[in-house]
């Protein structure tokens, strides 16, 4: 049996060590470190895959951003879109494959539900539904009372044609007060929407019944 330590070592060999000259920092909590990276590397033009900032190569700026902040959610999304745009698992101007950047994010912060959902979406788009399902199961374990997480899980399940799971996630998000209609409308459009069941009321005896003496 392969140990978790051996798996981590194998992963780091394939997708690189996390230690770097600047970082690694957590995108969720180290916000005070973001400024320099987003000013000089992850600019709006880089995020939208228009042009590079520090060089002519968009991928170099994306790579730097995800080296300093492995779980930078917006940069992960841009990296995924970059691979899709060039129709390649590893664009020529980035250090690792697109999937490696998700692996690095989750190796760095396994509890990052957003990064894990994005990885599930990546797996789904690459026809790897069983793996995507496993990632979403992990997300559900840490979702807590975050209605936005359930809503986004529902959208991914919908893309995977897992309609009952998508419906369950929509109901959970609605029960928590989330009213954005997109997921519901998409389920309605394909005839898969059902309103949440109303909790059944306890059966009570009428006044007349209560007054009737037992025989």
Stretches with model-predicted labels:
Residues 73-74, 113-114, 147-148, 181-182:
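Helix-start (N-cap) detector for alpha-helical repeat units in TPR-like alpha-solenoids
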Residues 7-63, 68:
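N-terminal leader/linker segments that initiate helical-solenoid repeat arrays
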């Amino acid at each position: 049996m392969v140990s978790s330590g051996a798996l981590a070592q194998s992963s780091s060999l394939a997708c690189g060590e996390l230690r770097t000259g600047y970082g690694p920092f957590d995108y969720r909590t180290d916000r005070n470190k973001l400024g320099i990276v987003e000013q000089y590397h992850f600019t709006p033009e880089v995020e939208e895959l228009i042009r590079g900032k520090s060089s002519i190569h968009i991928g170099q700026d994306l790579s730097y951003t995800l080296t300093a902040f492995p779980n930078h959610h917006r940069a992960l999304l841009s990296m995924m879109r970059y691979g899709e745009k060039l129709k390649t698992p590893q664009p020529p101007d980035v250090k690792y494959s697109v999937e490696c950047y998700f692996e690095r994010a989750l190796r760095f912060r396994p509890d990052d539900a957003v990064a894990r959902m994005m990885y599930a979406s990546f797996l789904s788009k690459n026809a790897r539904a069983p793996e995507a399902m496993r990632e979403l199961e992990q997300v559900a374990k840490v979702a807590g009372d975050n209605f936005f997480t359930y809503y986004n899980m529902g959208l991914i399940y919908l893309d995977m044609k897992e309609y009952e799971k998508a419906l369950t996630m929509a109901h959970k998000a609605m029960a928590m007060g989330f009213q954005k209609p997109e997921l519901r409308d998409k389920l309605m459009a394909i005839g898969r929407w059902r309103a949440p069941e109303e909790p059944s009321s306890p059966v009570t005896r009428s006044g007349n019944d209560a007054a009737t003496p037992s025989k």
